[in-house]
Amino acid sequence: MYSPYDFAIDPDMSKNYFTQAHRNELEWNFNLLKKKFIDKGYYVVITEMGATDKCNTEQRIAWGTFYVQRTRQLKMACVVWDNNSWNTNWDANEKFGLFHRDKGTFEPDSYVNALINAAKY
């Protein structure tokens, strides 16, 4: 679930700040999933989530930490998307690369660590 759209997947580089309105939208989506599935005894796995790289690592950390912690609190699991595509020229169109398969390293390491730490809560 790439939400909110303008922060998470819209390639517009100017939409690079994670706002309270974005938090509210995520909260609404998560609560809808909880009401429709969790409260009825079904498991929820969000099989794709991520925020395209707009050269805004700190904002992606804030988004990812909120996203993962909140889904964990609601008893949901999520899977981060990595498409091996990197932002190298200020083009944020589908730049979800996290793991350099050729080097065996993560980038940005701080974002990946934030997602992992948020899952531990």
Feature map (PLM): residue ranges:
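Aromatic-rich peripheral "rim/lid" segments of glycoside hydrolase catalytic domains that contact
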Residues: 56-121
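Extracellular glycoside hydrolase catalytic/binding regions
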Residues: 1-73
